[in-house]
UniProtKB/Swiss-Prot annotation:
It comes from Nitrobacter hamburgensis (strain DSM 10229 / NCIMB 13809 / X14). Residues 387-449 form the TRAM domain. Its EC number is 2.8.4.3. Transmembrane segments: none annotated. It catalyses: N(6)-dimethylallyladenosine(37) in tRNA + (sulfur carrier)-SH + AH2 + 2 S-adenosyl-L-methionine = 2-methylsulfanyl-N(6)-dimethylallyladenosine(37) in tRNA + (sulfur carrier)-H + 5'-deoxyadenosine + L-methionine + A + S-adenosyl-L-homocysteine + 2 H(+). This is tRNA-2-methylthio-N(6)-dimethylallyladenosine synthase. Residues 453-462 have a biased composition (Low complexity). Belongs to the methylthiotransferase family. MiaB subfamily. CDD domains: Radical_SAM. Residues 152-384 form the Radical SAM core domain. [4Fe-4S] cluster 2 binds at C166, C170, C173. The gene is miaB.
Length: 473
């Protein structure tokens, strides 16, 4: 019997890339590949790249330098290692990667990874392969379903892509150029995916897309369904006890989504709603096509139907032309909304975007200082949000054994890690936890129906940090 070939995937960036990596694993499993944690031992290494962060390309080339040494060592050991660059950097800079990095065998954009087996065969025959065009066919129709064993191994929470691409064209963002126009999957296909996950032990589904609440996929009645109607349908699937989604655009919050938050107990009261700035002048320069007050009104609509709802967001400081007055408006918005957590970044130009051509730049010193001030405010809000849980009883969906022996860790409705001392048979259940204290960003407590037994958290990320949001909206 031929031994399985080893596959190593390193993903950068958002939840969509995590999902894409899983689907690449599923696609290549049929070709005899199994995952390995070691790039050095792999027969195939895939860098699944993100183009949002600063110096994204440089990080890819740095990693490719390390892989060149690993590939050379594999050749000396009599093994053949193939290297693939996938994702949004591949889409944006495919020709440049081929030119600069001879170690790379295949470059493939995020809309074409269902072609990986053919591209690997082409590279073996011709030396290298590049595919960064947007294919006419829907890739989801060509992707194999994950095996039952793969689903169970990935745990009780899963991502499902319902929408890809973005039509908003914010001036700072590369997503419309790397992921293409907005495309929504049919309702029936999404239901089929979620049903298969539920049948194999998944209890929590996070619906993902670059602009997920712009979803308008074809329903079984032949009409486009809004996102809220899709959520209602998925909430009816037996076994699914929690629904989440990311990432949302304020302009696409339709009444059906608000109604879903009002009506569905399975829909978690935690919304990632990026705003980027609190200054109307900067929002206009970003082509956000909403004002700060528009954003406040959207938040109010959510809160009107679900008083326990909480929000996270994204912010950019130092966008071209941002003044101290503009930045003060951002601080005012953060203060007024009150976030459970947020991501904040210094502006960095993305080649090919309109903002990259703007001349009125902000100094690095000013950006650094503003980022510290903003993050301090966000951190104080997150700390207050977490402290408010102490002394209360919260529902926790338990996910896995913690690193500390005897502990089980799960997450609250707000993605806060919660640790208790308990047996592993609670994994997959939602149980009440009495919160006794905090350790770093984690809640420590005991099962409400069991004798109190203080847990000690292993290192856990802040709210939202373990599952980075889909960037670009």
């Amino acid at each position: 019997m031929t031994p399985p070939r080893k596959l190593h995937i390193k993903s950068y960036g958002c939840q969509m890339n995590v999902y894409d990596a899983q689907r690449m694993v599923d696609t290549l499993a049929a070709e005899g590949f199994v995952e390995t944690a070691s790039a050095e031992e792999a027969d195939l290494v895939i860098l699944n790249t993100c183009h949002i962060r600063e110096k994204a390309s440089e990080k890819v080339y740095s990693e490719l330098g390390r892989l060149r040494a690993a590939k050379d060592q594999a050749a000396r050991d009599g093994r053949e290692m193939s290297v693939v660059v996938a994702g949004c950097v591949a889409q944006a800079e495919g020709d440049e990667i081929i030119r600069r990095a001879p170690v790379v065998d295949v470059v493939v954009g995020p809309q074409s990874y269902h072609h990986l087996p053919q591209l690997l065969a082409r590279a073996k025959a011709d030396g290298r392969a590049l595919e960064t065009e947007f294919p006419v066919e829907d890739k989801f129709g060509f992707l194999p379903q994950p095996s039952r064993q793969a689903i169970r191994a990935r745990g009780i929470s899963a991502f499902v892509t319902v929408q890809e691409g973005c039509d908003k064209f914010c001036t700072f963002c590369v997503v419309p150029y790397t992921r293409g126009a907005e495309v929504s999957r049919p309702v029936a296909k999404i239901v089929e995916d979620v049903q298969r996950l539920a049948d194999n032990g998944v209890r929590e589904i996070t619906l993902i897309g670059q602009n997920v609440n712009a979803y308008h996929g074809d329903g079984p009645d032949g009409r486009p369904w809004p996102f809220g109607k899709l959520l209602h349908r998925l909430a009816d699937i037996p076994g699914i006890v929690r629904l989440r989604y990311s990432t949302s655009h304020p302009r696409d919050v339709e009444d059906s989504l608000i109604e879903a938050h009002r009506d569905l107990g399975a829909l978690m009261p935690f919304v990632h709603l990026p705003v980027q700035s609190g200054s109307d002048r900067i929002l206009e320069a970003m082509n956000r096509r909403h004002t700060a007050d528009d954003y406040r009104r959207v938040v109010d609509r959510f809160r009107h139907v679900r008083q326990d709802i909480a929000f996270s967001s994204d912010f950019i400081v130092g966008f071209p032309g941002e003044t101290e007055q503009d930045f003060t408006a951002t601080l005012a918005l953060v203060t007024q909304i009150g976030y459970a957590g947020a991501y904040s970044f210094k502006y960095s130009p993305r080649p090919g975007t309109p903002a990259a051509e703007m001349k009125e730049t902000v100094s690095t010193a000013d950006m650094d200082e503003r980022l510290v001030r903003l993050q301090n405010l966000i951190d104080s809000q997150q700390s207050a949000f977490n402290r408010a849980a102490v002394g209360t009883t919260v529902d926790v969906l338990f996910e896995r054994a913690a690193r500390n022996p005897g502990q089980i860790v799960g997450r609250t409705a707000y993605l806060q890690p919660a640790h208790v001392v308990a047996s592993a048979d609670i994994i997959g259940q939602i149980l009440p936890v009495t919160v006794a204290s905090l350790e770093r960003y984690s809640l420590l407590g005991s099962l409400a129906s069991a004798p109190a037994s203080r847990a000690s958290a292993d290192d856990a990320p802040p709210v939202g940090a373990s599952s980075p949001a889909i960037m670009g909206v």
